[in-house]
Structure formats: C-alpha cells, structure tokens
Design a protein with these regions (language model features):
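Short alpha-helix plus adjacent loop in nuclease-associated cores
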Residues: 64, 68-81
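Gly/Ser/Thr-rich active-site cleft segment
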Residues: 87-169
Length: 169
C-alpha cells in the first residue's frame, strides 16, 4: 500500500500529517488482511522526529518535520550546556542539526509549555506502534538518533537530559 507522505506547512512550520499517515497505515492493514492472517508487523519511518504526549496519552501539538527550520542555531544553545566534542564523545552520534537533541532545544526555547506539559515522548514509528497497540515503547536503534542515548548502557543518558534541562519523562 503506497501513499503520498508530503509534509504540511502551517504558519511557516513544516509538520508531518500523522493523522493522514495513520489512516493510510490502517488502510494498508485492511488490504493485507485480504490475503490472510497477519502474523506480525513492523513499523519503520524516518528517525529523529517525535510526538509529545500528555498525561492522558493525547498528542501535544503536531509532529514537526526534521526539515523544518526551527532547529537553526539550536546547536549553539545545546553547546552552552555541553561542548560539541564532549557530546559526540558521549553519544557517538554524528551531529545533524535536525537530530532530536536540537529539536527538543527548539521546543524548550520556542514552546517551553509543551515540554512542561509532556509526560512522555515517542519517536514517530513508536507513536504509530502505540496507536495500533496501546503500548508505549522506544525502539533502541531509532532512539539513538535522538543523540540522547548512552551507547554503553543502551539507555537514555539521564545525566545529559538533566544537563540540557529536558524532562526525564
């Protein structure tokens, strides 16, 4: 099942149309069921983009696309808390201005209420998994693209998250 996946621009911000994408995912499942029982399914999308959820697991705002310009100069903001070389040495992830670490800094700087309100964050494929199953999980390899994972412990780098002033939840 193929469908177009064009971002939507509203007031100068580029968003993913996750409602449309989820509708299309469900359409694909309906089509696949015509061929028999679905034994398993995986969800794979792009990395770095995420959805914030509130205490009722409702989405806070829309998913901003990594191509959006909101992360311009957010690397400098992050480096006020941790030097670039130290960040790379800590995470082993190549700097890309659209990495989640910079996107979260943009949210912190431009829409701080969203981070305060958020009770959880799911990467886009994990969000679709949640919508289909009701289970919140973070797939490790995708989580590493956030630049917030400790490659030694293979878990969130809580010290780094605290250093940046991001919520632990």
């Amino acid at each position: 099942h193929r469908f177009s996946n064009d971002p939507v621009i509203v007031n100068g911000t580029m968003y993913w149309d996750t409602l449309r994408q989820f509708f299309e995912i469900k359409q694909g499942i309906v089509k696949a069921k015509k061929y028999g029982i679905i034994d398993s399914m995986g969800i794979d999308t792009w990395a770095v983009d995420f959805v914030l959820l509130d205490e009722n697991d409702e989405r806070i705002g829309d998913a901003v696309a990594y191509r959006d310009r909101r992360t311009e100069d957010m690397d400098r903001k992050v480096y006020e808390f941790i030097p670039e070389d130290d960040l790379y040495g800590r995470t082993g992830i190549q700097k890309q201005i659209f990495n989640t670490i910079y996107q979260l800094m943009a949210v912190k700087e431009q829409q701080p209420g969203q981070l305060e309100w958020a009770k959880s964050m799911l990467m886009i494929p994990d969000y679709f998994h949640f919508l289909l199953t009701g289970k919140k999980v973070q797939e490790y390899t995708n989580a590493t693209t956030t630049q917030l994972v400790n490659p030694v412990t293979k878990d969130w780098d809580i010290e780094l998250i605290d250093m940046l002033g991001y919520p632990r939840r």
